[in-house]
Amino acid sequence: GRERVKKVLDAVDAEIADFERKISSGQSRERVLTEMKEAHEGFYASVRNIMRDAANDVALRSAIEGVVAELISVPEQFEVAIEMALGSALQNIVTKTEEDAKYVIEQLRRRNYGRATFLPLSLVRPRTLNENERAVTRTPGCFGVADELISYDNKYRNAVSNLLGRTIIVRDVDIGIAINKRVGGTLRIAT
């Protein structure tokens, strides 16, 4: 219920506070995100290491499309909501095929880098709203479906839709709860 939502929000607030300390040094939020992407700073060590190696390894680089955080562009007003909605999936490694994912997994294992989560474009299926659910997104205070509020190359549509196609971004928790009640609690909500 609401307590659980509060716990999630508190955890996210703690992460944001850390992020904002970096921002308070006069950097724009966008620059921090860009630096995070470029250095893969704030990423799991396994992801950071394999992406660093991919920069100098043609076979590895050709197997990896990128990490989710690099493949999406988020308007500033929705950054916190999208970060919250995606959580660790921001670090999922997108590959063209299952074979590419297997190759990268093998490289992670060989290099003792640990684990990572993969989204092979050949396998991943989009998640969408039904008509009834889509109708509630027109409620005042609902900004829309998360995957429709961000930009990305069309070839990543299924992956982005899989992660965000059933998440709606709302102005506040109360609106989210009210909307979700109307569709039987089937949607993910982010503020």
Give residue ranges: language-model regions.
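Extended, EK/Q-rich alpha-helical coiled-coil segments that serve as long dimerization/scaffolding arms
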Residues: 1-41
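Hinge-like oligomerization/junction regions that interrupt long coiled-coil arms in large cytoskeletal
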Residues: 25-191
